[in-house]
Amino acid sequence: MSNNQILFERAQKTIPGGVNSPVRAFRSVGGTPRFVARAQGPYFWDADGKQYIDYIGSWGPMIVGHVHPEVLSAVQNVLADGFSFGAPTEAEIEIAEEICKLVPSIEQVRMVSSGTEATMSALRLARGFTGRSRIVKFEGCYHGHADSLLVKAGSGLLTFGNPTSAGVPADIAKHTTVLEYNNVAALEEAFGAFGDEIAAVIVEPVAGNMNLVRGTPEFLNALRALCTKHGAVLIFDEVMCGFRVALGGAQQHYGITADLTCLGKVIGGGMPAAAFGGRRDIMAHLAPLGGVYQAGTLSGNPIAVAAGLKTLQLIQAPGFYDALTAQTKRLADGLAAEARAAGVPFVADSIGAMFGLYFTERVPTSFAEVTKSDTERFNRFFHLMLDEGVYFAPSAYEAGFVSSTHDDAVIDATLAAARRAFAALAA
């Protein structure tokens, strides 16, 4: 029995399902989860000492690679000063200033500890600001595990085949209207029917939790125009795509401004940190200035802030995103080329440092199209690549991530492994 198997059996005795987040359990793809012993750059090593090229990167945060020396040094420099204070620090101001500089639509920002906290707080703020209750979200978009957002969500729920979580009261779910992603006609119809009841529309402008699905410019521009017309708050959930698709996130990529933005992943540099922010007149409704309450003991934690601030500084290096985008595109295009050569129906897409792999005939644009993926073939591909030492997301419904440490040699090794994997699939 491998060390991974021993650890998984042991974990299941004290941890539900043996994991602290469902997708890690390999339930979708089968087999034994890999328990990570250490990581460095684009690699991690499991409990059995096997090395893997890592295309998850902690589900997005590790954009400069694992254990970047400057991030490590930044964390080490603050450790001796204290782990948590429950009081403000200068470092909180510094990371807030950096975020506001990089995402111009964010005039003020509030730090929290997780993406779920960010989206949950942004929705409460939007409701408090507008005095309305209804929110609109989109099929397959995952915004964390708050009750009102676990309605036809993607990510782990899609992996387990459950569009809506048990334990969500109908009285809460009734305030959430779910529309098809990228469907402008459905959006216009909804706003025509009850636009003046909508407090907020929350959307992943680049969805990463039903695999990678891009929002179309037409769809996102329609969202912006309709929210403005009806006085609804437009919330971009950029927890995943923020600082991933461009330095200024999806808003820079599309040239569309949100009223509120949720951030996470990259802004913690691998530590637990997230944020929400936006227009000053909306943020002024937050306590202690306004009547919308939001708080957190570990919000703005000094260690997380140190890691996040250094990461945000590193990604501003000249040419950083050009190189990262090019490497990610090279990976996606290369995988698609290897599949074509083997005669395997497969397509790939990338935007910035995110990519999607699909066992379909074309790149999907909606939740419904994503669910047509050949999951059995994906599962075989996943395990073939895992055996080759390449770690993709253990689900056909998750995006992948590339870091600045995934150099040409790493991409070449991945494509060589994929050539063998696709050949095995075609046999």
From Swiss-Prot:
Compartments, as annotated in UniProt: Cytoplasm
Necessary cofactors: pyridoxal 5'-phosphate
Class of this enzyme: isomerase
Catalytic activity field: (S)-4-amino-5-oxopentanoate = 5-aminolevulinate
Lineage: Bacteria, Pseudomonadati, Pseudomonadota, Betaproteobacteria, Burkholderiales
EC number: 5.4.3.8
Quaternary organization: Homodimer.
PANTHER family: GLUTAMATE-1-SEMIALDEHYDE 2,1-AMINOMUTASE, GLUTAMATE-1-SEMIALDEHYDE 2,1-AMINOMUTASE 1, CHLOROPLASTIC-RELATED
Single GO molecular function: glutamate-1-semialdehyde 2,1-aminomutase activity
A Pfam cross-reference name: Aminotran_3
Matching SUPFAM superfamilies: PLP-dependent transferases
Residues with the N6-(pyridoxal phosphate)lysine modification: 265
Predominant location: cytoplasm
Coiled-coil ranges (or none): none
Keyword hit for Isomerase: yes
Record GO biological process: protoporphyrinogen IX biosynthetic process
Entry protein name: Glutamate-1-semialdehyde 2,1-aminomutase
Keywords: Cytoplasm, Isomerase, Porphyrin biosynthesis, Pyridoxal phosphate
Organism: Burkholderia lata (strain ATCC 17760 / DSM 23089 / LMG 22485 / NCIMB 9086 / R18194 / 383)
Family: Belongs to the class-III pyridoxal-phosphate-dependent aminotransferase family. HemL subfamily.
Pathway noted in the entry: Porphyrin-containing compound metabolism; protoporphyrin-IX biosynthesis; 5-aminolevulinate from L-glutamyl-tRNA(Glu): step 2/2
Domain of life: Bacteria
A single Gene Ontology CC term: cytoplasm
InterPro entries reported in the protein's UniProt record: 4pyrrol_synth_GluAld_NH2Trfase, Aminotrans_3, Aminotrans_3_PPA_site, PyrdxlP-dep_Trfase, PyrdxlP-dep_Trfase_major, PyrdxlP-dep_Trfase_small
